[in-house]
Amino acid sequence: MQIEVEKLTDFSLMKKVVKHVFNLDTRASLAKWYNSEHSPIRTQLFAIFAYDVPYSVCMQMRTHDKNGALFLIESGRPDAYGSDRVKSQSGNYREQPRNIFIMCNAQHLIDWSHKRLCGKAEKPTREFFSLLKRQIANVDADLAKMLVPKCVYRNGLCTEFKPCGER
């Protein structure tokens, strides 16, 4: 599994939006904005290219597309697009890893991390999101610090019916 992340916008856009919408010249750092989780952080957009992602992880991540993020998942059907990669795979197409593209904002990533870094998440999903967090750190270290399991976010309070006991 491999993940590449591109940050599509920068802090200057967020400052311009804050000035335009709220008539404020913000002096707060990007880290402070991420910590506040106020709506302007949604101006920080990311393109994520993930390769050979387990099918189960693709499907778990896809559950997050209802909040405005874009998810495009490589088809596993041998009759779709005539891909040599797909044609070379034999057996149940649901067992084959997929390439996935995600376009999302900073708030999406913060919200998803609460579930996907949780000890109750499937191990391959935690591995995927841990790798994603490391790649996010390469383009936005302030955001990467905010990507934590919900129990960390809530200072040790776990809201799962059966806590994992990690914290």
Spans of features found by a protein language model:
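Family-specific signature for flavin-dependent thymidylate synthase
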Residues: 1-167
